[in-house]
Amino acid sequence: KKFINYFSRNNYVKVLSPSSKNIDKKESKLSYQGFKSSNFLQKIIYILISLFKWKPMQLGYFYSPKIKKYVLNNLDSYDLVFLQSLRVAQYLPENINKKTILDMGDITSKNYYQTSKRLFFLNPLKIIYLLEGFLVEKYENFCFMNFSKILLFSKKEIDSIKSNFKK
């Protein structure tokens, strides 16, 4: 929220997010549009589609065709695109010619690998966490290569990423 308030001081800012219902409101230079989230069955289908495409399950869980359509139809209206998590990076088309910033927070794949290591080897969740860790790491690398800037919280994590990703 701090980034949004900072950006909206001198720029027009449009915030898109999943919501319990469709919402559209505006306050001076800041406007908000909420898109109703997919239902449970749709989420399961989107998760399976993500797995079929070798992308993280969480991308499928949080996928919204309405947000995707809005972004594709309105992208040319903005000078800068700021995305606040790995999960929403999926809405940005590849090879975009705009300044893009992704606030990842932390390197999520490491969390999945750590959780997988702590689970008993016969626990089926171990395989799910390991698979999601691999898919998230692959997607993180894609984001590092395709975004103008990536924001991370921890200096330790910044230092741990490959030098060819540092911008």
Predicted regions and their residues:
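N-terminal subdomain of nucleotide-sugar transferases
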Residues: K1-Q33, D76
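Membrane-proximal helix-turn-helix segments that form the acceptor-binding/catalytic region
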Residues: F3, P65-L72, T108, L125-I150
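Hydrophobic/aromatic residues located in beta-strands of well-ordered beta-sheets
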Residues: V13-V15, T100, I150
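Alpha-helix capping/helix-boundary segments
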Residues: K21, R87-V88, K156-I158
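Acceptor-binding helix/loop patch of EC 2.4 sugar-transfer enzymes
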Residues: F40-G60, T100-K138
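Short N-terminal targeting/anchoring amphipathic segment
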Residues: V71-A89, K98-I101
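Helix-loop-beta element that forms the nucleotide-linked donor phosphate-binding surface
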Residues: P93-K98, F142-F153, I158-K167
